[in-house]
Regions:
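Short, surface-exposed "cap/lid" segments of acyl-processing enzymes
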Residues: 41-83
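Primarily recognizes the serine-hydrolase "nucleophile elbow" in alpha/beta-hydrolase
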Residues: 143-190
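C-terminal catalytic histidine-bearing segment of alpha/beta-hydrolase fold enzymes
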Residues: 249-310
Length: 310
């Protein structure tokens, strides 16, 4: 897989961060973007658990990363909120250590379809199913478990919902993507979707193109998919390729904005580096969900959660 196709989720290029500024293990978080002191689910019947799935450093290979604190600021703001008289908890689920079985996928000259074995996305999906079963066995009803995901985590979440909707209350996905910066690199705005995808297939090979198409078609076969999807036309990944989600009955799609503002407010990423707060303007729409401005959509998210957990 070429470097320019690496799906980077929470890489902060401009700074070097202490390990304490990263979230590298599974667990519940609090409003301060730290791991909660209590990692148990007390009174599980009156809790709503949001399982948050990060993006990926690479499409099919393993990584030691998970996410950065600045990336969960908006998710952390939901912790403790009451919906239908039930309290929200947010669980960070780190699965980037998983690897697909056929890593030749992005090596055009070496890969011979079909994909042999289980992809990283499928392994992440299966890991989520195991985690869901764990929480259910502890007493949390299936409908009170919501899957959340960004980028590759969001793409995987849509796959999960299309197959196992009965196991969860719903899905909230932001910038679902996992096949590189197709919108930007293949000039979707200039060429149009069809020609851009032809260029993508020609350059990267049938392996990635076929797998992407297969996964989209599977998701689109859903008769009803009551999920909440956030996209942005300036997202260099799937930004101008996301209209297909509206073909699925039940999908609630939110186009975040047409620029790098939300409701007229400029978006800033606010994080912690070596114990000190920092901020910078959001420059890439793929990461606008990390901006402080994204909390404008908290009422929409809470309304969706309420509709799926009543």
């Amino acid at each position: 897989m070429k470097k320019n196709f690496i799906i980077i989720f929470f890489t902060i290029i401009f700074c070097s961060s202490a390990s304490a500024d990263k979230l590298l293990k599974n667990g519940f978080i609090n409003n301060n973007m730290n791991y909660a002191e209590l990692q148990k689910v007390n009174d599980p019947k009156n809790k709503i658990i949001l399982i948050y799935n990060h993006g990926q450093d690479t499409h099919d290979a393993a990584s030691k990363n998970c996410l950065w604190k600045n990336g969960v600021r908006n998710m952390a703001s939901l912790v403790g909120e009451k919906v239908n008289e039930k309290e929200i908890m947010v669980y960070i689920f780190c699965t980037d250590h998983l690897a697909g079985d056929d890593k030749r996928l992005w090596k055009k000259k070496k890969f011979k379809p079909p994909y042999k074995g289980v992809t990283k996305l499928e392994k992440r999906l299966n890991a989520n199913l195991e985690l869901i079963d764990k929480f259910v066995s502890m007493g949390t009803p299936n409908k009170q478990i919501i899957i959340m995901g960004q980028s590759c985590g969001g793409w995987m979440s849509l796959m999960l919902a299309s197959r196992y909707l009965e196991k969860i209350g719903g899905v909230i996905t932001t910038m679902p993507a996992c096949y590189g910066e197709i919108t930007r690199d293949f000039k979707v705005k200039k060429r149009g979707i069809e020609k851009a995808l032809e260029k993508f297939r020609k350059k990267e090979g049938d392996g990635p193109a076929d797998l992407r198409e297969k996964q989209i078609n599977e998701i689109k076969q859903s008769n009803n998919l009551p999920v909440l999807v956030f996209t942005h036309p300036m997202d260099p990944y799937e930004g101008l390729l996301s209209d297909w989600v509206e073909e699925i009955p039940g999908v609630q799609r939110i186009i975040i904005s047409e620029d790098l503002k939300i409701n007229g407010k400029k978006c800033k990423r606010i994080g912690i580096n070596n114990g000190k707060k920092w901020s910078e303007p959001v420059k890439n729409a793929h990461y606008i969900i990390m901006g402080d401005c994204f909390q404008y959509y908290n009422p929409v998210i809470l309304e969706y959660i309420a509709s799926r957990t009543k």
